[in-house]
Swiss-Prot record:
GO biological process: isoleucine biosynthetic process; L-valine biosynthetic process
Reported cofactor(s): [2Fe-2S] cluster; Mg(2+)
Keyword line: 2Fe-2S, Amino-acid biosynthesis, Branched-chain amino acid biosynthesis, Iron, Iron-sulfur, Lyase, Magnesium, Metal-binding
One Gene Ontology CC term in the entry: cytosol
Molecular function terms from GO: 2 iron, 2 sulfur cluster binding; dihydroxy-acid dehydratase activity; magnesium ion binding
Classification via InterPro entries: Dihydro-acid_dehy_C, DihydroxyA_deHydtase, DiOHA_6PGluconate_deHydtase_CS, ILV_EDD_C, ILV_EDD_N, IlvD/EDD_N
UniProt-listed PROSITE patterns: ILVD_EDD_1, ILVD_EDD_2
The protein's name: Dihydroxy-acid dehydratase
Top-level taxonomy: Bacteria, Bacillati, Bacillota, Clostridia, Eubacteriales
Binding site for [2Fe-2S] cluster: 119, 191
Catalytic center residues: 468 (proton acceptor)
Binding, Mg(2+): 78, 120-121, 442
Native source species: Clostridium kluyveri (strain ATCC 8527 / DSM 555 / NBRC 12016 / NCIMB 10680 / K1)
Reactions that this protein is recorded to catalyse: (2R)-2,3-dihydroxy-3-methylbutanoate = 3-methyl-2-oxobutanoate + H2O; (2R,3R)-2,3-dihydroxy-3-methylpentanoate = (S)-3-methyl-2-oxopentanoate + H2O
Length: 556
């Protein structure tokens, strides 16, 4: 075992002395050492319950003959970090989480790992670490929050963001805004729609790195505790059989994840995270592949913000395995792949029926015959950009309008809130990319302001930043190359006509080649906004959105 280096032989007496100091018995030291990565903290609603999950995992590991040892991982609440400088620090934590987990696992020679994440960057960061370390690993998340209720209708985090826009537009009272504030987030857990956290927890299940139910069992259900115990027991089987992350997260598994991403209508952030996780597994996952998969994958689920169902309804309808079973009627999944259950995908999903055909549409009656996410290209985004097609109003799938250009989120939000953006406009927010931000902030506040003011069917927003999974509307992000490196988005001027055709996967602005070259010759790179600390290091190493904003090691 890996832990033999710190537990066996006379040479390991100093290490055993320190393990004794932990209160471990001789018998515990001789068992496999299972690291449990706890992301518990008291600032993230989706992580406040993880101590309960961790204790259940520890019980499961002990029941199956292992020695559980807990160590921490950080986690940011994107909702709390939203709309201020804190959002620059969200995406960057994905790599901090991967790096620090690698360091802890290697330094202490764990035999296996159980990852306990829940929210946005925490899940992909730990998946990246798992792929990088390639020691037996299983995931069990904290689970989704239950939806709230206002006026008898279910609501979630996206509802409060749009309520702010409605209040600023004079459409609701301050009292109604306060009601939304007090009711949209009624329990612990990851926010209740198909936002980024739940998207990634569901896709972890699809990849084969978590047991069935991981993405959908609500945080407050006792089944979540049972799932954690089963995960703790299962890791011992994975260790015995030496089933490792790269055995599970194969190229075919990532294609399954992209397919299910389209079927579920996941967050556009998945288009950043899946390539980054694949990269750590030694697999190149080109985002262009998404359109090929989308073209043959029907969108079966419209969970919030795209629709009025929530993850709790998806759980009751049969969960991710039921959606996989439905999609597999079209033979779109590789089902012979091994998973963390010790069984194949086919064995996992066998008999998992669709219990609610309103929540999970049959393949014969999908929301659309193509997937929930689209990759667009054109002279505005030569390398690519991304949009959550399933959350775009039908009338905005094709749009043409004048550019309203802003060089930061704050200026754009002020213009929207003061009525300077009108029907037909295309809001451009640039210098918010991975390097330019730095940190690629989410533009939830501007998109929510657009929706809240009733402009969701007439105004588009384009950015080299990214979006919260709670965003809906014609919100097009991850424009690559970004403005900070001289991408064409930096050359757009106020009033330029922008042409968006989501069904044709195109995005352009009207300009002659001569004028484009003239603007390019006049463009000058901007000085970095931040020159010290982690963000400065991050900006110097990060790649573009179309590559998953991975960090590139400098060549010496």
């Amino acid at each position: 075992m890996r832990s033999d280096v710190i537990t066996k032989g006379t040479k390991s007496a100093p290490q055993r002395a320190l393990l004794n100091a932990l209160g471990l018995t001789k018998e515990e030291i001789e068992r496999p050492l299972v690291g449990i990565v706890s992301s518990k903290n008291d600032i993230v609603p989706g992580h406040m319950n993880l101590d309960k999950i961790v204790e259940a995992v520890k019980t499961g590991v002990s029941m199956a003959g292992g020695t559980p040892i807990v160590f921490p991982a950080i986690a940011v609440c994107d909702g709390i970090a939203m709309g201020h400088q804190g959002m620059k620090y969200s995406l960057v934590t994905r790599d901090l989480i991967a790096d620090s987990t690698e360091a802890m696992a290697m330094a202490h020679a764990f035999d296996a790992l159980v990852m306990v994440p829940n929210c946005d960057k925490n899940v992909p960061g730990l998946l990246m670490a798992a792929a990088r370390l390639n020691i037996p690993t299983i995931f069990v998340s904290g689970g989704p929050m239950l939806a709230g209720k206002v006026d008898g209708c279910k609501v979630s985090f996206s509802s409060i963001s749009e309520a702010v826009g409605a209040f600023n537009g004079g459409k609701i009272t301050e009292e109604k805004l306060e009601e939304f504030e007090s009711k949209v987030c009624p329990t612990c857990g990851s926010c209740s729609g198909m936002y980024t956290a739940n998207s990634m927890n569901c896709l972890t299940e699809v990849l084969g790195m978590a047991l069935g139910g991981n993405g959908t069992i609500p945080a407050v259900y006792s089944d979540r505790i049972k799932l954690a115990k089963h995960a703790g027991m299962k890791i011992m089987e994975l260790l015995e059989r030496n089933i490792r992350p790269r055995d599970v997260m194969t190229e075919a598994a990532f294609k399954n994840a992209l397919t299910m991403d389209m079927a579920l209508g996941c967050s556009t952030n998945s288009m950043l995270h899946l390539p980054a996780i694949a990269h750590e597994a030694g697999i190149e996952l080109n985002v262009d592949m998404a359109n090929e998969i989308s073209a043959k994958t029907p969108n079966l689920c419209h969970l919030a913000p795209a629709g009025h169902n929530y993850v709790e309804e998806l759980n009751e309808a049969g969960g991710i395995y039921a959606v996989m079973n439905e999609i597999n009627k079209l033979n779109l999944l590789s089902t012979d792949l091994i998973t963390c259950t010790g069984k194949t995908v086919a064995e996992n999903i066998k008999g998992c029926i669709n219990k609610n055909k309103e929540v999970i549409r049959p393949v014969e009656n999908p929301y659309s015959t193509t997937g929930g996410i689209a990759i667009l290209k054109g002279n505005l985004a030569p390398d690519s950009c991304v949009v959550k097609r399933s959350a775009v109003a039908p009338e905005m799938l094709k749009h043409e309008g004048p550019a309203r250009v802003f060089d930061c989120e704050e200026d754009a939000l002020n213009a929207i809130n003061t009525g300077k953006i009108v029907a037909g406009d295309v809001v451009i927010i640039r210098y918010e990319g991975p390097k330019g931000g730095p940190g690629m902030r989410e533009m939830l506040n501007p998109t929510s302001a657009i929706m809240g003011r009733g402009l969701g069917g007439s105004v588009a927003l384009i950015t080299d930043g990214r979006f919260s999974g709670a965003t809906r509307g014609a919100a097009i992000g991850h424009v690559s190359p970004e403005a900070a490196v001289g991408g064409n988005i930096a050359l757009v001027e106020e009033g330029d006509i922008i042409k968006i055709d989501i069904e044709a996967n195109s995005i352009d602005f009207e300009i002659s080649e001569e004028e484009l070259e003239r603007r390019r010759s006049n463009w000058k790179p901007r000085q970095p906004k931040i020159t010290t600390g982690y963000l400065a290091r991050y900006a110097s190493m990060v790649t573009s959105g179309n590559r998953g904003a991975i960090l590139e090691i400098p060549k010496f």
